[in-house]
Amino acid sequence: MSKVCEICGKRPTTGNTVSHSNKKNKRWWKPNVQKVKVIVDGEVKKMRVCTKCLKAGKVQRAV
């Protein structure tokens, strides 16, 4: 499943996990993307939307 928000374009990003001894290991931070039914131009469509966009009300959910 693609981890990209179709509204804001948020996608996974990389970085390092840093241990107490300062060793660095690569890791991924993934956005919390949900598959939701959304009303777009009067039609119901399934989209992948991050929870930040859902909370902000950037999409109108279909009931």
Curated annotation (Swiss-Prot):
GO molecular function, one term: structural constituent of ribosome
UniProt keyword Flavoprotein, yes or no: no
One example of a Gene Ontology biological process annotation: translation
Ribosomal protein among keywords: yes
UniProt KW keywords: Ribonucleoprotein, Ribosomal protein
Highest rank taxon of the organism: Bacteria
InterPro entries (UniProt xref): Bacterial_rp_bL28, Ribosomal_bL28, Ribosomal_bL28/bL31-like_sf, Ribosomal_bL28_bact-type, Ribosomal_bL28_sf
Gene Ontology CC: ribonucleoprotein complex; ribosome
Gene3D superfamilies reported for this sequence: 2.20.150.30, Ribosomal protein L28/L24
NCBIfam families: L28
Family note: Belongs to the bacterial ribosomal protein bL28 family.
Protein name, entry field: Large ribosomal subunit protein bL28
Designated gene of the protein: rpmB
